Amino acid sequence: MTELSIRPEEIRDALREYVDSFQATSAGREEVGRVVVTGDGIARVEGLPHTMTNELLEFSGGVLGLALNLEIGEIGTVILGEAEHIEEGQEVRRTGEILAVPVGDGFLGRVVDPLGRPIDGLGEIQAEGTRALELQAPTVVQRQPVKEPLQTGIKAIDAMTAIGRGQRQLIIGDRQTGKTTVAIDTIINQRDNWASGDPSKQVKCVYVAIGQKKSTIREVVNTLEEAGALAYTTVVAAPADEPAGFKYIAPYAGSAIAQHWMYNGQHALIVFDDLSKQAEAYRAISLLLRRPPGREAYPGDVFYLHSRLLERCAKLSDELGGGSLTGLPIIETKASDISAYIPTNVISITDGQIFLESDLFNQGVRPAINVGTSVSRVGGSAQTKAMKSVAGRLRLDLAQYRELEAFSAFGSDLDKASRDQLARGARLVELLKQPQNQPYPIERQVVSIWAGTTGKVDDVPVADVRRFESEFLDYVGRSHRGIYDAILGSGKLGDDVIQELNSAIAAFKNQFTLSDGKPLVNEAAASPLDPSAVRKESIPVHRAPARTDDEG
């Protein structure tokens, strides 16, 4: 039996080889905390003293949480996901990452959750990078004035409360007054710009659904898909059954996706539907985290909640690429009270508001825009010259009409001027009515409003105004296409175009038939008389003899 001998040199070489092959990169420091209290989508965690504000924490099972309250000894965390399996005593680990979402063109045509994860069953999304949710808005020197129009396709808005690229225009009104429809029509109206392939015209859209029913979100997606608008739109969905944390971060996730395009020199549009539900979710989170309540139980920083979100909408300077992000926040009022806390906050932040009134909606005026309380602080700077020239008197005429309409309800006798004003106002209201999901191109809007403000439809019965408008616009497109081309080409309404418009509407009136079967123009123009057919007669004139002085 041979004896086993161990040489010290072999042991030394083996140890040296092992030490040389050891990789120390896998070693690191990991902070581990524990759940102290959990419930209602909130967890209080202790043992993570180096956690940052808005840092993501990882619970057992891979559920993420957002650190909002950094207190002495514990952290108040909002759970982003299913909280049923989180129990007291479970381990919680730091991720060292601030909340961010993936961004890029791969999100166009997709439906994602507030963390950027696809929920439409169409597979993974190839992202171009990530963008933090909490980023500083563009500074004053990084912006430029809003001066490029963003057409909504809605006559009442483009004429009276114009929206420009980089503007923040609030859509406010009671429930079921058409707020979402206005926003969806604006997205659909960008379809022709997208089809043009011109990056300076294309507008990429983001629709953020906050606290809505899943069936409603599905309906919006179907509407966009049927209209061919989903190809350039991203839907960020935080339905009503999602935790409050998702509803809180959804608008920031949508704006991060849109800001990626803005900072790349492109144009984007984002719709927040609606911020009232985000404020309610933030109120619930703040109360559960035991933050001091203020007016209507909202926390003291609820103004900052919306201001830091909406200030991200901007028209960037040319040095930064000239990109833009236009925001359409939606706020729901109760009993048309626009003086409530959240509505007044958002009104003071935005560049104007479109107020939709339930009374007008119930009267069949759709979109139900209240002209008196709707305003755009950008105004004519975001309008083409053609639209500005025809829409100048529209707001004044409608405001006077509403005032006279209320006065005439008392049964008072009115003079002819007042009756004429009422008649024209009723026809203007009919002209501004518009079917759902059928935005008008800008050239058709200009011709329609020109016909109304110049009194060309004053002789058309109110019941026939909308049919007259539709058929006349089609007639111009067939027989006077040069009018549309001139409006689109120069952006102006020159004297030659107005002259051709007068000829076109006069010719169309001669062939238009009212709903009762009678022609609009009752008598055809009389043909000139043939001189040979005129019979000349001489009439004898008998003069009395002159009187003499003797006869006097």
Swiss-Prot record:
Comp. bias intervals (Basic and acidic residues): 533-552
Stored InterPro entries: ATP_synth_asu-like_sf, ATP_synth_asu_C, ATP_synth_asu_C_sf, ATP_synth_F1_a_nt-bd_dom, ATP_synth_F1_asu, ATPase_a/bsu_AS, ATPase_F1/V1/A1_a/bsu_N, ATPase_F1/V1/A1_a/bsu_N_sf
Catalytic activity: ATP + H2O + 4 H(+)(in) = ADP + phosphate + 5 H(+)(out)
One of the Pfam families matching this protein, by short name: ATP-synt_ab_C
Known EC number: 7.1.2.2
UniProt similarity note: Belongs to the ATPase alpha/beta chains family.
NCBIfam families (UniProt xref): atpA (TIGR00962), PRK13343.1 (NF009884)
Name listed for the protein in its UniProt record: ATP synthase subunit alpha
Gene: atpA
